[in-house]
A protein has these predicted regions:
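Active-site neighborhoods and metal-handling regions in enzymes and metal-associated proteins
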Residues: 2-169
Length: 169
């Protein structure tokens, strides 16, 4: 089912920007807590407390379609939407933390990949390539740009580096 794109007014854009900025603040804050020995459940608790109490926002994933936590933590080979729990991070792991906050009716949604200690060579290549894909995608965003064209640039670059994109989850 295709949904029509709804144009936003200046107030909507301002509130969207704020939601995005709050999401970035959570990602910046949690990075200092990503280290060997911490559990993904502990990272979830830290983020939940920060989102609710410091930012006065709502963690969107919590109870969404039965999702039991406030963030998603995808460790190593988990592609996306990993559920935080008792798993302890260890040196060499990589963890993607996906944050979505709701503030004043708008969602801010972003994720960031963090190395735990010193990442293995392939993990570092993955993180570097993902960042380069992000930068390439952003570089072609402009009025009139088509989502398919942006995705194609990202896919082609990822595949040229020996990686693939997620088609379904």
């Amino acid at each position: 089912i295709l949904m029509a794109i709804q144009l936003k007014n200046d107030d909507d854009l301002s509130r969207m920007r704020i939601a995005g900025q709050l999401t970035r603040q959570v990602l910046d804050m949690i990075g200092t807590h990503v280290k060997p020995g911490v559990t993904t459940g502990e990272l979830d608790e830290i983020c939940h407390d920060y989102i609710v109490n410091s930012l006065q926002a709502v963690p969107a994933p919590l109870n969404y379609r039965g999702f039991p936590k406030s963030i998603c933590t995808s460790v190593n080979h988990v592609v996306c939407h990993g559920i935080p729990g008792d798993k302890r991070l260890k040196n060499g792991d990589i963890v993607n933390i996906d944050i979505t906050v709701i503030k004043d009716g708008f969602h801010g949604d972003a994720s960031r990949m963090y190395p735990v200690g010193k990442p293995q060579i392939m993990a570092q290549r993955l993180m570097d390539t993902a960042k380069e894909c992000l930068e390439l995608g952003i570089s072609v965003v402009r009025p009139g740009a088509r989502l398919g064209d942006i995705g194609s640039i990202i896919q082609n670059y990822a595949e040229s580096k020996g990686f693939s994109i997620v088609r379904e989850y």
